[in-house]
Amino acid sequence: MRLFTYPTPDLIHIKLKVKIRIHPPLHISSTAGFDIIAYLLQIVQTAFKPLQMPSEIIGIRLCKGYFMSLHSDILVVGAGPAGLSFAAELAGSGLKVTLIERSPLTVLQNPPYDGREIALTHFSREIMQRLGMWDKIPENEIYPLRDAKVLNGRSDYQLHFPQPTEARGEPADCLGYLISNHNIRRAAYEVVSQLDNVSILTDTVVKEVKTSDNEAQVILENGKILTARLLLAADSRFSQTRRQLGISSDMHDYSRTMFVCRMKHTLSNQHTAYECFHYGRTIALLPLEEHLTNTVITVDTDKINSVQNLSPEELAASVKEQLKGRLGDMELVSSIHHYPLVGMIAKRFYGKRSALIGDAAVGMHPVTAHGFNLGLSSADILAKLILEAEQRGQDIGASSLLEKYSNKHMLHAHPLYHGTNMMLKLFTNETAPAKLLRGLVLRAGNNFPPLKKLITKQLTG
């Protein structure tokens, strides 16, 4: 290990090691331990500043490959599924990535059940398999989605998307897969936690972000400053990072609230998903096990008491009644979680030395259950462009690269987001003309093969 001797401003000669090894292994977070480490780094930087040494070579390597430096190649604000997936894409690249997450480490290691089931396309499965995430999810908690049906109002007429025979040019026996959100988050963290080139700062709040022609800068709430060649916002559809970057967005408050829970039932769901646009409230059914279904109830926000005030037995009975006994007797078997519904799409997905991924770029209405697919796709597109640029010795934060990413992701995200909103506007409109049109749309979907094929392709990825 190299030693450097250099006079400090007060002319006292000191010896400083560039690398500091700490035992036992630590996970970096904004704790007192990190404060001490950061202080040591500041001493090193002060001592070596006259030598004009690059800040990125002054850092701390912890056991198990964790590396923390005041300078990284890429800073990612948000260690949710999109941020973690992006970091996993850069495994073995040599690029130093630092993720900044306000949640504690225990939440990343063991995310709590939040009621949300994610519908994954075949393309998303391919990405997750390549990144090593798929194999970390218990096989018995990956649920195939065979069929999908859409109902309208009080009618029993169904728009039916049957079990496919192929997807993405390969044989397939399902439209996609359903996996609990907390299982995806856990798998993503397990992959990233083993990467030598990735650091995760937990319990850490970002106060401010700045970008210039040469670098991006993140100022933490504790006063510390981190820099990088590129900054990514992956901190939810309500992203403060996006706002500070000056990237505007179209945000739509649907004025509705979604309740999610698991229910057992006496009749088989036949691995079929239902979207029931009934009058008054919408029910979505996502099949897990044959007699276990994730139940999503959506009501106008001013009517949430009509759900919240029900006992578990009353809620199960009301769902059974609304489904006309389609799944037999119902029983609530999980906690109930509720979320206000807000959609968002950014005007563009990049800024100066910065880009948006995941929900910070596009926050979909959960009616599609496909929000994570978009987030995963955004991470995949951007990571591939960055890896290509790095291999060619090009600037990974160049505006031309980031604009290319933005255009490519927008090409898919824009029509999906606005198309979903148009559908929701129609199927939550209960005027007489809208009710008539809703029925006609379902029939057109069943009897116009090109349209059905297009929607099926979207479902399968």
Curated annotation (Swiss-Prot):
<dbReference type="Pfam" id="PF01494">
    <property type="entry name" value="FAD_binding_3"/>
</dbReference>
<keyword id="KW-0503">Monooxygenase</keyword>
<dbReference type="InterPro" id="IPR010971">
    <property type="entry name" value="UbiH/COQ6"/>
</dbReference>
<comment type="similarity">
    <text>Belongs to the UbiH/COQ6 family.</text>
</comment>
<comment type="pathway">
    <text>Cofactor biosynthesis; ubiquinone biosynthesis.</text>
</comment>
<keyword id="KW-0560">Oxidoreductase</keyword>
<dbReference type="GO" id="GO:0006744">
    <property type="term" value="P:ubiquinone biosynthetic process"/>
</dbReference>
<comment type="function">
    <text>Catalyzes the hydroxylation of three positions of the aromatic ring during ubiquinone biosynthesis.</text>
</comment>
<dbReference type="GO" id="GO:0008682">
    <property type="term" value="F:3-demethoxyubiquinol 3-hydroxylase activity"/>
</dbReference>
<dbReference type="InterPro" id="IPR036188">
    <property type="entry name" value="FAD/NAD-bd_sf"/>
</dbReference>
<dbReference type="InterPro" id="IPR002938">
    <property type="entry name" value="FAD-bd"/>
</dbReference>
<keyword id="KW-0285">Flavoprotein</keyword>
<protein>
    <recommendedName>
        <fullName>Ubiquinone hydroxylase UbiM</fullName>
        <ecNumber>1.14.13.-</ecNumber>
        <ecNumber>1.14.13.240</ecNumber>
        <ecNumber>1.14.99.60</ecNumber>
    </recommendedName>
</protein>
<keyword id="KW-0274">FAD</keyword>
<dbReference type="InterPro" id="IPR051205">
    <property type="entry name" value="UbiH/COQ6_monooxygenase"/>
</dbReference>
<keyword id="KW-0831">Ubiquinone biosynthesis</keyword>
<dbReference type="GO" id="GO:0071949">
    <property type="term" value="F:FAD binding"/>
</dbReference>
